[in-house]
Amino acid sequence: MNPFKMQQMLSQAKEMQEQMQEKLAATVVEASSGGGAVSVKMNGKKELLKLTIDPAAVLSLSGANPDVEMLEDLITAAINEAGRRAEEILKSSMQGLLGGLNLPPGLF
């Protein structure tokens, strides 16, 4: 392969990667658990942007038997669901970006 052509392809790949990172950073997914008691926003890079806990869920922690574990589970579930949604967006974007390259299935 022509070295100039190879350099040009590498430059294009780097530019595409930068564009993808910008797109992922700008993409926001939301997820909630416990009927909306806990909600999260995460970007496509799987960075947690916001965690919201309904005050009623916090009030349930007062009293003789606070259910801290339940609130922890709701937070974990919401974060994990947002992560799954962000992963779906990442896979979809990568497939669109690399669709014409005939790469082996399951690589991305």
UniProtKB/Swiss-Prot annotation:
One of its GO terms (cellular component) is cytosol. GO terms for molecular function: DNA binding. Signal peptide: none annotated. The keyword Thylakoid does not apply. Coiled coil: none annotated. It comes from the Bacteria. Its main location: cytoplasm. Keywords: Cytoplasm, DNA-binding. Pfam families: YbaB_DNA_bd. The keyword DNA-binding applies. It is found in: Cytoplasm, Nucleoid. InterPro entries: YbaB-like_sf, YbaB/EbfC. Binds to DNA and alters its conformation. May be involved in regulation of gene expression, nucleoid organization and DNA protection. Belongs to the YbaB/EbfC family. Homodimer. PANTHER family: NUCLEOID-ASSOCIATED PROTEIN YBAB. NCBIfam families: DNA_YbaB_EbfC. This is Nucleoid-associated protein ACP_0492. It comes from Acidobacterium capsulatum (strain ATCC 51196 / DSM 11244 / BCRC 80197 / JCM 7670 / NBRC 15755 / NCIMB 13165 / 161).
